Protein backbone atom coordinates (compact mmCIF):
# COMPACT_ATOMS: atom_id res chain seq x y z
CA UNK A 1 0.00 0.00 0.00
CA UNK A 2 1.26 3.47 -0.88
CA UNK A 3 1.72 5.55 2.28
CA UNK A 4 1.06 9.09 1.07
CA UNK A 5 0.39 10.96 -2.14
CA UNK A 6 3.47 12.22 -3.95
CA UNK A 7 4.23 15.90 -4.29
CA UNK A 8 3.83 17.35 -7.78
CA UNK A 9 6.33 19.99 -8.84
CA UNK A 10 7.81 21.48 -11.98
CA UNK A 11 11.13 19.93 -12.95
CA UNK A 12 14.38 21.89 -12.85
CA UNK A 13 17.66 21.17 -14.67
CA UNK A 14 18.82 19.26 -11.57
CA UNK A 15 16.00 16.75 -12.23
CA UNK A 16 17.09 15.87 -15.77
CA UNK A 17 18.65 12.50 -14.90
CA UNK A 18 15.63 11.32 -12.89
CA UNK A 19 13.30 12.52 -15.64
CA UNK A 20 15.38 10.73 -18.29
CA UNK A 21 15.13 7.50 -16.29
CA UNK A 22 11.34 7.79 -15.98
CA UNK A 23 11.02 8.51 -19.71
CA UNK A 24 12.45 5.04 -20.38
CA UNK A 25 9.34 3.59 -18.74
CA UNK A 26 7.21 5.25 -21.42
CA UNK A 27 9.66 5.22 -24.32
CA UNK A 28 12.09 2.29 -23.78
CA UNK A 29 14.07 3.19 -26.91
CA UNK A 30 14.51 6.86 -25.98
CA UNK A 31 18.12 7.95 -26.27
CA UNK A 32 17.87 11.71 -25.83
CA UNK A 33 21.19 13.11 -24.60
CA UNK A 34 21.01 14.29 -20.99
CA UNK A 35 22.38 17.68 -22.02
CA UNK A 36 19.51 18.11 -24.50
CA UNK A 37 16.92 17.16 -21.88
CA UNK A 38 18.49 19.57 -19.39
CA UNK A 39 18.35 22.42 -21.91
CA UNK A 40 14.72 21.65 -22.77
CA UNK A 41 13.75 22.31 -19.15
CA UNK A 42 14.60 25.99 -19.68
CA UNK A 43 12.29 26.32 -22.72
CA UNK A 44 9.31 28.58 -21.92
CA UNK A 45 7.27 26.78 -24.61
CA UNK A 46 7.11 23.65 -22.46
CA UNK A 47 7.17 22.26 -18.96
CA UNK A 48 7.82 18.97 -17.21
CA UNK A 49 6.09 18.04 -13.98
CA UNK A 50 7.36 15.34 -11.64
CA UNK A 51 5.59 13.31 -8.99
CA UNK A 52 7.95 12.83 -6.04
CA UNK A 53 7.30 10.32 -3.26
CA UNK A 54 7.97 11.17 0.39
CA UNK A 55 11.38 9.46 0.16
CA UNK A 56 12.34 11.69 -2.79
CA UNK A 57 11.93 9.04 -5.48
CA UNK A 58 10.40 10.36 -8.71
CA UNK A 59 7.44 8.12 -9.55
CA UNK A 60 5.86 9.85 -12.53
CA UNK A 61 6.12 12.70 -15.01
CA UNK A 62 4.09 14.72 -17.47
CA UNK A 63 5.55 16.73 -20.35
CA UNK A 64 3.57 19.54 -21.95
CA UNK A 65 4.42 21.86 -24.85
CA UNK A 66 2.67 24.71 -26.54
CA UNK A 67 1.81 23.94 -30.13
CA UNK A 68 1.05 26.87 -32.38
CA UNK A 69 0.40 24.77 -35.49
CA UNK A 70 -2.82 22.83 -36.06
CA UNK A 71 -3.38 19.98 -33.62
CA UNK A 72 -5.79 17.27 -34.79
CA UNK A 73 -9.24 17.65 -33.26
CA UNK A 74 -8.69 21.07 -31.69
CA UNK A 75 -10.39 24.38 -32.43
CA UNK A 76 -7.94 26.95 -31.06
CA UNK A 77 -4.30 27.96 -31.06
CA UNK A 78 -2.02 27.74 -29.25
CA UNK A 79 -2.88 24.39 -27.72
CA UNK A 80 -1.22 22.70 -24.78
CA UNK A 81 -0.04 19.27 -25.92
CA UNK A 82 0.59 16.48 -23.44
CA UNK A 83 3.71 15.02 -25.04
CA UNK A 84 4.31 12.35 -22.42
CA UNK A 85 2.52 11.13 -19.29
CA UNK A 86 3.85 8.25 -17.23
CA UNK A 87 3.42 6.83 -13.75
CA UNK A 88 5.45 3.89 -12.43
CA UNK A 89 3.28 0.74 -12.41
CA UNK A 90 3.18 0.41 -8.62
CA UNK A 91 1.75 3.96 -8.39
CA UNK A 92 -0.81 3.62 -11.18
CA UNK A 93 -4.39 3.92 -9.96
CA UNK A 94 -3.36 5.97 -6.90
CA UNK A 95 -4.23 9.40 -8.32
CA UNK A 96 -0.69 10.34 -9.34
CA UNK A 97 -1.60 10.54 -13.02
CA UNK A 98 -4.55 12.82 -12.27
CA UNK A 99 -2.39 15.05 -10.07
CA UNK A 100 0.22 15.35 -12.82
CA UNK A 101 -2.51 16.16 -15.31
CA UNK A 102 -3.93 18.85 -13.00
CA UNK A 103 -0.51 20.55 -12.96
CA UNK A 104 -0.37 20.36 -16.76
CA UNK A 105 -3.87 21.82 -17.04
CA UNK A 106 -2.98 24.75 -14.77
CA UNK A 107 0.23 25.46 -16.71
CA UNK A 108 -1.65 25.26 -20.01
CA UNK A 109 -4.38 27.64 -18.82
CA UNK A 110 -1.75 30.07 -17.51
CA UNK A 111 -0.14 29.99 -20.97
CA UNK A 112 -3.42 31.25 -22.45
CA UNK A 113 -4.64 28.01 -23.97
CA UNK A 114 -8.28 26.96 -24.13
CA UNK A 115 -7.56 23.32 -25.00
CA UNK A 116 -5.25 20.51 -23.96
CA UNK A 117 -4.59 17.74 -26.47
CA UNK A 118 -2.69 14.47 -26.42
CA UNK A 119 -2.12 11.35 -28.45
CA UNK A 120 -1.26 7.71 -27.93
CA UNK A 121 -0.48 4.68 -30.01
CA UNK A 122 -3.56 3.04 -31.53
CA UNK A 123 -2.86 -0.24 -29.72
CA UNK A 124 -2.27 1.31 -26.27
CA UNK A 125 -5.72 0.72 -24.79
CA UNK A 126 -4.43 1.41 -21.25
CA UNK A 127 -3.45 4.94 -22.31
CA UNK A 128 -6.81 5.41 -24.02
CA UNK A 129 -8.61 4.44 -20.81
CA UNK A 130 -6.44 6.76 -18.70
CA UNK A 131 -7.11 9.69 -21.03
CA UNK A 132 -10.87 9.05 -21.05
CA UNK A 133 -10.96 8.64 -17.26
CA UNK A 134 -9.40 12.09 -16.91
CA UNK A 135 -11.82 13.82 -19.27
CA UNK A 136 -10.13 13.62 -22.67
CA UNK A 137 -12.34 12.77 -25.62
CA UNK A 138 -11.10 10.90 -28.67
CA UNK A 139 -11.12 13.10 -31.76
CA UNK A 140 -9.77 10.87 -34.54
CA UNK A 141 -7.48 7.99 -35.40
CA UNK A 142 -4.66 8.43 -37.84
CA UNK A 143 -2.39 5.99 -39.62
CA UNK A 144 0.89 7.48 -40.82
CA UNK A 145 2.56 6.39 -44.05
CA UNK A 146 5.99 7.00 -45.51
CA UNK A 147 7.62 6.52 -48.88
CA UNK A 148 11.40 6.35 -49.20
CA UNK A 149 12.61 8.43 -52.14
CA UNK A 150 15.60 7.53 -54.23
CA UNK A 151 18.09 10.37 -54.61
CA UNK A 152 17.71 12.24 -57.88
CA UNK A 153 20.44 11.66 -60.40
From Swiss-Prot:
Binding site for substrate: 27, 70, 83, 119, 140
GO molecular function: aminoglycoside 6'-N-acetyltransferase activity
CDD domains xref list: NAT_SF (cd04301)
EC number(s) given by UniProt: 2.3.1.82
Reactions performed catalytically: kanamycin B + acetyl-CoA = N(6')-acetylkanamycin B + CoA + H(+)
SUPFAM superfamilies: Acyl-CoA N-acyltransferases (Nat)
Biological processes annotated in GO: response to antibiotic
Domain N-acetyltransferase: 6-153
Alphabetically ordered keywords of this record: Acyltransferase, Antibiotic resistance, Transferase
First-tier enzyme category under EC: transferase
PANTHER family for the chain: AMINOALKYLPHOSPHONATE N-ACETYLTRANSFERASE-RELATED-RELATED (PTHR43877)
Function: Catalyzes the transfer of an acetyl group from acetyl-CoA to the 6'-amino group of aminoglycoside molecules conferring resistance to antibiotics containing the purpurosamine ring including amikacin, gentamicin, kanamycin B, tobramycin, netilmicin, and isepamicin.
Subunit field text: Homodimer.
Protein name: Aminoglycoside N(6')-acetyltransferase type 1
Amino acid sequence: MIASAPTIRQATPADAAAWAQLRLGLWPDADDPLEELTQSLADAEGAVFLACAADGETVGFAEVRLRHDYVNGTESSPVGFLEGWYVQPQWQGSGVGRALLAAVQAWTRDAGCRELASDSRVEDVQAHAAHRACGFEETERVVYFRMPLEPSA
